[in-house]
């Protein structure tokens, strides 16, 4: 059994439970995936599996090393590939195997990893939730970051200083989302809550460990 699966975010909607409760859900196009490479402790030093999301991609868009790996695994095209570390009980996976969404069941807990929407350059108030200064009464300090370091010592800006910069477009993990439904015919996974990224963005779905 694979520890996870790759897919795309379709979008959000809502469903109604039998008691009338409204549940916000996200639809994920999960799989089908193929095992592109199987790593073992004897050959690679650790136990892992590389999955590729099967989808059409122009041959000229694939570099030669990747094309060789895909041909060896019998995969026609895979634009999105990720690696999963394997634990006990996953020895049955081998190169060329298919991974489908039917490995998940309703009420399972999953973690979803995606790339958040990019929002361009943002200041410290929007990016780091700084309070800012007074809005009036002669104040000339409104949304400025303020001091970013001392003077003679250490005479530099320390690493990790919260400043303005690119907001979003970063990897985000949402943990312990409940699986509401699984559509094995259309390879659709329905999870409760929101998932990072735009509609059509690639996501990685794995079983929760917490």
From Swiss-Prot:
Query: What's the superkingdom here?
Result: Bacteria
Pfam families named in the record:
Ribosomal_L3
Q: Name one GO cellular component term.
A: cytosolic large ribosomal subunit
Q: Which GO terms describe its biological process?
A: translation
- Record-level Gene Ontology MF annotations: rRNA binding; structural constituent of ribosome
**Keywords recorded for this protein, A-Z:** Ribonucleoprotein, Ribosomal protein, RNA-binding, rRNA-binding
| InterPro entries from the UniProt entry | Ribosomal_uL3, Ribosomal_uL3_bac/org-type, Ribosomal_uL3_CS, Transl_B-barrel_sf
Which HAMAP family does the record match to this protein?
Answer: Ribosomal_uL3_B
Q: Which family does it belong to?
A: Belongs to the universal ribosomal protein uL3 family.
Name of the molecule in the record: Large ribosomal subunit protein uL3
Q: What species was this sequence derived from?
A: Solibacter usitatus (strain Ellin6076)
């Amino acid at each position: 059994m694979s520890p996870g699966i790759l897919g795309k975010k379709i979008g959000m909607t809502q469903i109604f439970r039998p008691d009338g409760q409204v549940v916000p859900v996200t639809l994920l196009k999960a799989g089908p995936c193929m095992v592109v490479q199987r790593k073992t402790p004897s050959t690679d030093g650790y136990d892992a599996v590389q999955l590729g999301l099967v989808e059409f991609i122009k041959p000229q868009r694939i570099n030669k090393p990747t094309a060789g790996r895909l041909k060896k695994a019998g995969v026609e095209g895979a634009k999105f590939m990720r690696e999963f570390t394997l634990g006990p009980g996953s020895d049955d996976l081998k190169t060329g195997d298919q991974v489908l969404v039917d490995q998940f069941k309703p009420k399972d807990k999953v973690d979803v990893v995606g790339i958040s929407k990019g929002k361009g350059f943002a200041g410290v108030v929007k990016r780091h939730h700084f309070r800012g200064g007074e809005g009036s009464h002669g104040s000339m300090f409104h949304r400025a970051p303020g001091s970013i370091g001392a003077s003679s010592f250490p005479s530099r800006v320390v690493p990790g200083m919260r400043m303005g910069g690119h907001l979003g477009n970063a990897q985000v993990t949402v943990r312990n989302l409940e699986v509401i439904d699984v559509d094995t015919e259309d390879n659709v996974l329905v999870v409760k809550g929101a998932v990072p990224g735009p509609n059509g963005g690639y996501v990685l779905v794995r079983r929760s460990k917490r």
